[in-house]
């Protein structure tokens, strides 16, 4: 069974570049080696940030590829856990991971480290390098 993953925006930005050492993570998604769990809030952030770091066309194409992929699962978290207090915007990823029963969130953001200290609900966070190692298994 495929692992279910929530990708923080900073990691999505790193894996989509054709010249990135993390590009295999994007290709693994396209090949169905993991399921990407997203919400409308997450897709909106992906679009906003991709438009800023690349352009509107790239943002549109990447978000469309995610939406249309059979390896994407959409979730609509109705309950907001508020587990990350330092950056409330990060909670959209946590809420999606909980509702999706995701195996983990992939993030390089230090704010997510607080989740290691919260016993319930348990949310695992992996760095991009750890995720890459998982994909090689």
Q: Which residues are covered by each model-predicted region?
A:
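Hydrophobic/aromatic ligand-binding patch that stacks against planar heteroaromatic rings
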Residues: 28, 96, 117
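Active-site neighborhoods of divalent-metal-dependent phosphate/nucleic-acid chemistry enzymes
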Residues: 71-105, 110, 114
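Short, well-structured alpha-helical segments
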Residues: 59-67
């Amino acid at each position: 069974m495929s692992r279910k993953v929530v990708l923080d925006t900073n990691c999505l930005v790193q894996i989509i570049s054709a010249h990135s050492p993390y590009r295999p993570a994007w290709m693994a998604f396209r090949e169905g080696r993991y399921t990407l769990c997203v919400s409308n809030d997450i897709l909106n952030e992906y679009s906003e940030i991709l438009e800023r770091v690349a352009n509107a066309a790239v943002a549109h194409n990447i978000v469309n590829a995610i939406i249309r992929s059979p390896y994407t699962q959409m979730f609509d978290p109705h309950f907001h856990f508020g587990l990350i207090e330092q950056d409330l915007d990060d909670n959209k990823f946590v809420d999606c991971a909980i509702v999706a029963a995701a195996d983990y969130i992939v993030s390089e953001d230090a704010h997510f480290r607080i989740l290691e200290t919260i016993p319930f609900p348990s949310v695992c966070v992996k760095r991009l390098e750890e995720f890459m190692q998982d994909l090689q298994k």
